[in-house]
Amino acid sequence: MDYVLITFASTYGAIYAQKLLAPVAPVQVMPVLREVSLGCGMAVRLHPEDLPAVRAAMAGSQLKPEEYAFYAVTGTGETLQAHRIT
């Protein structure tokens, strides 16, 4: 896995997560890959090694689990693969 994306059902969720996660791990808000969109068009990108701390922070947040999803992303362009992490 090259990086992890968190996708969101709403723009509010993406902005909220960016603020929530800033003290936990370096994150970047970016346009979501259409292969993994939950609807709002924004995602938070993070390093795979930060996933456990980020998951813990998200689990303790006001966002409901159905409002966001984690994806493992590998490759770029035509070789890009994204798989949901459960």
Regions found by a protein language model. Give the residues of each.
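C-terminal structural segments of small proteins and small subunits
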Residues: 52-86
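Short glycine-/aliphatic-rich beta-strand segments at the starts of folded cytosolic domains
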Residues: 3-7
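Short connector loops at helix/strand junctions that flank enzyme active sites
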Residues: 1, 37-41, 65
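Amphipathic, hydrophobic secondary-structure cores in small proteins
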Residues: 9-11, 19-22, 26-56
